[in-house]
Amino acid sequence: MNQLYQRSFLRLMDFSMNEIMYILRLSHFLKQQKSNHTETQKLHKKNIVLIFENHSTRTRCAFEVAAFDQGARVTCLTPNISQIGHKESIKDTAKILGRMYHGIQYRGYNQDTINIFAQYSNVPVWNGLTEQFHPTQMLADLMTMQEQVPHKSFCKIKLAYVGDARNNIGNSLLEAASIIGFDLRLVSPREFWPQQELLTTCRKLTKLNKVNILLTENIQEGVKDVDFLYTDVWVSMGENEKVWTHRISLLSPYQVNQDMINYTGNSNVKFLHCLPALHNNETTIGKKIAHKHNLFNGLEVTNEIFESKHSIVFDQAENRLHTIKALMISTLLPNLYHKNITFHTKN
């Protein structure tokens, strides 16, 4: 029996450690099947709708290709072609889409919006990103960690996230570590630490699961001996540029560069980033920030590190496809995908 059938995935805490590990096992299996051209379509005649309130490259492509690989049909709704939240309420939209589609992906701003979709659609809803959480990214991150250090269980893995730890990646990593059990260091100015409510919830889990989570402003302490260094962008489009200036001034010491790599003491440390990354001035926004703040070798990460042997960001991005495929299969099929991939607690 598939215990994830008809379940929504709005944040990582919606699933147990056992359930997340099942999705990861299925992800590895599906990746191998795709590579071997032996994949079996299990989502034939399923209809999936992808809702985007903001721009997307990796999330949209991963959901679309995953659905197509599995034989599902996809509709994509963007703000310029839908009435969601403008002429039609979220609640009403959820009710009608739930009658037409087997699953809904939502990528937008407010976590409350996706919660309404899940409450009223009566079909699985998957969080492609909100300002609060990015759980589908976490599945790809966990899979990538397993691939890079296959000799280590999660409880032996150390990861440092540096920069803005209050964003959706920082929040989701906090949940991931609390559930899965890897050693997490959030290395950030105190102003950018996660909200106290989330910290309190996760600390209860860490005590239960005997997990080590460190919040520190001290870079050398935070990154010492880690297996993975992770960061995310510091600025977002649409924000006031005064906000950018304030953030950059506080976060500039937390740039992932060669000095930080050296501080880890691990010559094989791997670099993670959910992308897009401002690692050079080849983009419009990168060029603007470089000239205004005199940062010509990247913002949150230098181009040297982004292009180095340490960087596994494109493996990480590819794994969005395999984990999203596993998530859709797990929540849309009443039975297990393969008899040899079952629910158990080993990590």
From Swiss-Prot:
<dbReference type="InterPro" id="IPR006132">
    <property type="entry name" value="Asp/Orn_carbamoyltranf_P-bd"/>
</dbReference>
<feature type="binding site">
    <location>
        <position position="232"/>
    </location>
    <ligand>
        <name>L-ornithine</name>
    </ligand>
</feature>
<dbReference type="GO" id="GO:0042450">
    <property type="term" value="P:arginine biosynthetic process via ornithine"/>
</dbReference>
<comment type="similarity">
    <text>Belongs to the aspartate/ornithine carbamoyltransferase superfamily. OTCase family.</text>
</comment>
<comment type="function">
    <text>Reversibly catalyzes the transfer of the carbamoyl group from carbamoyl phosphate (CP) to the N(epsilon) atom of ornithine (ORN) to produce L-citrulline.</text>
</comment>
<feature type="binding site">
    <location>
        <position position="320"/>
    </location>
    <ligand>
        <name>carbamoyl phosphate</name>
    </ligand>
</feature>
<dbReference type="GO" id="GO:0016597">
    <property type="term" value="F:amino acid binding"/>
</dbReference>
<feature type="binding site">
    <location>
        <begin position="236"/>
        <end position="237"/>
    </location>
    <ligand>
        <name>L-ornithine</name>
    </ligand>
</feature>
<feature type="binding site">
    <location>
        <position position="83"/>
    </location>
    <ligand>
        <name>carbamoyl phosphate</name>
    </ligand>
</feature>
<dbReference type="InterPro" id="IPR006130">
    <property type="entry name" value="Asp/Orn_carbamoylTrfase"/>
</dbReference>
<feature type="binding site">
    <location>
        <begin position="274"/>
        <end position="275"/>
    </location>
    <ligand>
        <name>carbamoyl phosphate</name>
    </ligand>
</feature>
<protein>
    <recommendedName>
        <fullName>Ornithine carbamoyltransferase</fullName>
        <ecNumber>2.1.3.3</ecNumber>
    </recommendedName>
</protein>
<dbReference type="Pfam" id="PF00185">
    <property type="entry name" value="OTCace"/>
</dbReference>
<dbReference type="GO" id="GO:0019547">
    <property type="term" value="P:arginine catabolic process to ornithine"/>
</dbReference>
<dbReference type="GO" id="GO:0005737">
    <property type="term" value="C:cytoplasm"/>
</dbReference>
<keyword id="KW-0963">Cytoplasm</keyword>
<feature type="binding site">
    <location>
        <position position="107"/>
    </location>
    <ligand>
        <name>carbamoyl phosphate</name>
    </ligand>
</feature>
<dbReference type="InterPro" id="IPR024904">
    <property type="entry name" value="OTCase_ArgI"/>
</dbReference>
<dbReference type="GO" id="GO:0019240">
    <property type="term" value="P:citrulline biosynthetic process"/>
</dbReference>
<dbReference type="InterPro" id="IPR006131">
    <property type="entry name" value="Asp_carbamoyltransf_Asp/Orn-bd"/>
</dbReference>
<dbReference type="Pfam" id="PF02729">
    <property type="entry name" value="OTCace_N"/>
</dbReference>
<feature type="binding site">
    <location>
        <begin position="56"/>
        <end position="59"/>
    </location>
    <ligand>
        <name>carbamoyl phosphate</name>
    </ligand>
</feature>
<dbReference type="GO" id="GO:0004585">
    <property type="term" value="F:ornithine carbamoyltransferase activity"/>
</dbReference>
<feature type="binding site">
    <location>
        <position position="168"/>
    </location>
    <ligand>
        <name>L-ornithine</name>
    </ligand>
</feature>
<keyword id="KW-0808">Transferase</keyword>
<dbReference type="InterPro" id="IPR036901">
    <property type="entry name" value="Asp/Orn_carbamoylTrfase_sf"/>
</dbReference>
<dbReference type="InterPro" id="IPR002292">
    <property type="entry name" value="Orn/put_carbamltrans"/>
</dbReference>
<feature type="binding site">
    <location>
        <begin position="134"/>
        <end position="137"/>
    </location>
    <ligand>
        <name>carbamoyl phosphate</name>
    </ligand>
</feature>
